[in-house]
Amino acid sequence: MIEAMTKSPETLTEVHGAISPKVLFEELRRGVLGQDRALRFASVAIHKHLLGKVSGNILLIGSSGTGKTTIMNNIQRLYDTVPGFENFRAVTILNANLLVDSDRTEFRPDRMFSAIEQRARVILGERPSLAALKETMERATVCVDEVDKMSTVIAGKPNPIGVVLQQGLLTLMEGERVPYRLHAFDGEKDREQTVEIDTRKMMFVCGGAFEGLYDQVYNRVSRSGSGERIKTEAVKTADGG
């Protein structure tokens, strides 16, 4: 359950531009219970994102009900709540399968950009300029849920759709200029233009259950002669056993 933030937004506004990961962490944990370690990583990534540095993309791994989507929603709540963060409010949460055309086995980044564009227009209001729309989109935070469902291998066989998704998503996360058509006001009337959306300043938060990952790690570190120094006992207790 996500709880409303109770700290005054003005507290953050006063230090905007140099807001520390510690302050961000305290704000995020007001809406997420029992996930402090994940929130610390998220706080550092958001801090870099706000300062315009290369964002630290995040992969959230955990079974259903552990709070992955809650963390994504709470990141969006942080941007929506704090005055002064308007330029970073283009946050979109989508399912991984929406990024692939299964019929054509084709990666569809335009679907992601469309969701970001819709959010950016809400933020900027009626008839935004092309420059403002492009800049807001390039500062977006993209949350992709259930990335594990698009595995490259299913039942021991290659999954072309999963391969296409992973390659396409990794390309965007590493930084890519992608052509995208935008309708924007040029001072006289609305025009449609093709612009290049630069993903280098976007922050990506991906989440998935990754069922079977624990067994793979356990088998690796407990295998005789594996060369791994992690103790088997430590792996056993990691799952509460």
Residue ranges and their predicted role:
Residues 35, 42, 95, 169, ...:
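Residue-level signature of catalytic and energy-coupling elements of molecular machines
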Residues 61, 70-83, 119-129, 148-241:
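Canonical AAA+ ATPase core
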Residues 17-57:
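Pre-Walker A (pre-P-loop) alpha-helix and adjacent loop at the N terminus of AAA/AAA+ ATPase modules
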Residues 47-94:
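Walker A/P-loop
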Residues 92-137, 180-185:
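Short glycine-rich substrate-engagement loop in P-loop NTPases that contacts/grips substrate
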Residues 53-56, 86-89, 130, 135-140, ...:
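Short loop/turn elements that form and flank the Walker-type P-loop nucleotide-binding site
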